[in-house]
């Protein structure tokens, strides 16, 4: 299964965000690029939250998503948030995955409203990854608010749980992108490009991304 994006266009007033954008997504992929270039807008279009001005897409089947806002149920604890949207996910699996991502047993009992930003982000990531009937994953900056060790753990969990499902993961974190081991693309104008040997062997592209990250 693939996500096929053909000639998408989107404007907000006088600003063009996407122009004649096309991309064939086969399996898990990372999308990078400068802030404001249209990465989040692209995901919102694929989720049906924005309407494109032109173009079409196909292959987004029963998507699960990580948004820039975590959108947890504030009165529920982390386990219950996962079970609520897991479509048959059992509490034992939810608890196991949360503990593996650095939660202490006592923290599993806290309502989401009392969790830190990084903890909420980990719950949001697992909520998408553990949704049992999701066939497509659209993940917008899922590692925000995590330290280096938690990012490493989150990357391992993401790779394990995504499998080969069509996935677009947006990130400014070049190190995390490389750790994932997926195809890395850079959103530039109307294309999603990648150097022949990936960003790790393209110093100019890597430097651009690091500048973007440091400027945030």
Language-model-detected regions and their locations in the chain:
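Helix-to-loop junction immediately C-terminal to a conserved catalytic motif
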Residues: 47
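Q-loop/switch helix immediately C-terminal to the Walker
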Residues: 75-93
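Conserved ABC ATPase signature
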Residues: 111-115, 119
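ABC ATPase nucleotide-binding domain "signature" region
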Residues: 123-130
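Conserved beta-strand-loop-alpha-helix hinge in the C-terminal portion
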Residues: 187-216
